[in-house]
Amino acid sequence: MLTTAKANPLEALRSAKENKELSGQLEHHRSLRAIKLKVLLYREEREAAGVPPDVISRECATLHGSLLRNYMEEAQEARRLGAAELAQKTAERFASAFQVRPGSLGDAFDRRHREVERQAAEGARKEAIERRIVERVKRIKGE
């Protein structure tokens, strides 16, 4: 009697992070393969042209090193941009979660700016008190 174990479909699914990592590894592999293919095609082209093997080996090594260096620089730049983008998104999420209003760095510590805000708030408070007093006086006179 042969029974088949049913796999949990939720366990079969990978997380988005795992998929992104696997996709990155696959892209890395494809890029390295493309570099090797370019070097191989160059080698065949040079052999068909009748160039000596030692010269071909040096040229291919130089080409491979150059292509690999360019790829690594591009990959590093892409990683740096991805990290910066992720940091920006995280900062935006925190800012919205804590209801931080946009402004320049150090606004909260600018004494002149804080003093102007304090004076404006004090003026608004005094105006509100004066309005209430005027309304009371009008009500009292009206009675």
From Swiss-Prot:
Transmembrane segments: none annotated. Belongs to the CWC21 family. The keyword Acetylation does not apply. This is Pre-mRNA-splicing factor U5-Cwc21. It comes from Trypanosoma brucei brucei (strain 927/4 GUTat10.1). GO terms for biological process: mRNA splicing, via spliceosome; RNA splicing. Keywords: Cytoplasm, Nucleus. It is found in: Cytoplasm; Nucleus. Residues 27-70 form the CWF21 domain. Essential protein involved in pre-mRNA cis- and trans-splicing. May function at or prior to the first catalytic step of splicing at the catalytic center of the spliceosome. May do so by stabilizing the catalytic center or the position of the RNA substrate. GO terms for cellular component: cytosol; nucleus; spliceosomal snRNP complex. Its main location: cytoplasm. InterPro entries: mRNA_splic_Cwf21_dom. Associates with the NTC complex (or PRP19-associated complex). The NTC complex associates with the spliceosome after the release of the U1 and U4 snRNAs and forms the CWC spliceosome subcomplex reminiscent of a late-stage spliceosome. Associates specifically with U5-containing snRNPs.
